Every structure is written in C-alpha cells, then in structure tokens.
Amino acid sequence: MSGVMGIDEAGRGPVFGPMVVAGVLAPKRELGLGARDSKELTRSARRRLIRALMSDERLRVDLRIVWPWEIDEEGVAKAEFEAIRELVRRAMPDEVILDKPGNYSPERLRRELDLPEGINLIAEERADAKYEVVSAASIVAKTYRDWIVRLLELEYGEVGSGYPSDPRTVDRLRRELRRGGELLKYFRRSWETYKRVESEVKQRKLEDFF
C-alpha cells in the first residue's frame, strides 16, 4: 500500500486500562475533516469526527490494544514501539508521522521501530497538533480507549478516569486489592501507584491481624 500514516496513542500514563495505539492511513497529511488533537476536543466532537473518519473511503483506520499485562511484562515504551511496528507493517505506507517520544534521535527511533527500508519517518513534538492525519489517529485512539474503559465500568462499576491522580481510581484499586477482585487484572501492577497502594493494603492487613 502507499500513502501517509499518522500514528498516536491514548492511555500511556493511566494505572488502569489499556493503552490504545491507532494508525490512520491517508493519501496525504491533511484530510479536510477539521480533526485536531483529541485532548482539545469535547466528547461529542470526538464522536462526530470518529464517525466521519470511519465512513471516509479515502482512509484506512487500524489500531492495536495494548493490555495492562503486556505493559507490565514488556514496559510501556517497548509495548508502544511493538504496536507501532505492527501497524506500520500491516499498512506499509510511504511515510509515517508520529509524536517524538522522549529524547530519541531520528536514527535511534528508526532502529527501535525497525521500520522497513523506504518508509519516510517524521517524528516531531506535538505532531498531533501539526498534522491532521496524526490528529485523526489521536481521536481514534482516545475514543476507543474511552469505550473500553466504559465497557469495563458497565461490567464492574465505576473506576474513574484511570489516572493515578484520580482519587476514584485509586480508591477502586484499594478496594480491589483488599478483596482480590477480578478487576485487578486491568490495573498496571508495574506502576508506582499500584505498588504503593498494594503496600498500604498489606500493611493495614498486618495491623488488623495484630
């Protein structure tokens, strides 16, 4: 195939739920849909744009769901790179555009991603605000992660945003650790928040025992 593939992720930082890495393959960088960084859009605006993206015959949308146990096993950076690599190899675009991760040089990033020869790589800070094809990927990733978290809440009850800064999420983690709930598998055990709360719960159980 050919074209430009914008790639972005949602859910890199939360202690709960998956990370979703999305790719949008388009004939060119700009789509003319008015897409911009998903973090700047309301939920209703994201829904409107996701419908437009999914129904646009010029575009091919793909995604990879990275579950918490994968992140715990591989680390978030490696898991993200593997997801990006998978999306690129399925689409084989002429060009890939994504947010520049950390202090990676273009040469090191290309090595880490193991991109096939001939694919042009553009990695820039705030690429999701500069290139509409990356904005579109950002919208897809954010929308799908929100849907997954919502489905989990429908089954297990409120979890909150999933971020370590959300008291609802931390409180739910604490309750699940106390009772060994099934929902625990959707929390990232390698996160400092998980380790801290787990330590608190164990300490409290010891105090209650004595």
Curated annotation (Swiss-Prot):
HAMAP family: RNase_HII_A (MF_00052_A). Manganese or magnesium. Binds 1 divalent metal ion per monomer in the absence of substrate. May bind a second metal ion after substrate binding. Its main location: cytoplasm. Residues 2-203 form the RNase H type-2 domain. SUPFAM superfamilies: Ribonuclease H-like. Belongs to the RNase HII family. It comes from the Archaea. It catalyses: Endonucleolytic cleavage to 5'-phosphomonoester. This is Ribonuclease HII. The lineage of its organism: Archaea, Methanobacteriati, Methanobacteriota, Methanomada group, Methanopyri. The gene is rnhB. One of its GO terms (molecular function) is manganese ion binding. The keyword Hydrolase applies. The keyword Cytoplasm applies. Pfam families: RNase_HII. GO terms for cellular component: cytoplasm; ribonuclease H2 complex. Gene3D superfamilies: Ribonuclease H-like superfamily/Ribonuclease H (3.30.420.10), Ribonuclease hii. Domain 2 (1.10.10.460). It is found in: Cytoplasm. Endonuclease that specifically degrades the RNA of RNA-DNA hybrids. InterPro entries: RNase_H2_suA, RNase_HII/HIII, RNase_HII/HIII_dom, RNase_HII_arc, RNase_HII_hlx-loop-hlx_cap_dom, RNaseH-like_sf, RNaseH_sf. It comes from Methanopyrus kandleri (strain AV19 / DSM 6324 / JCM 9639 / NBRC 100938). Its cofactor is Mn(2+); Mg(2+).
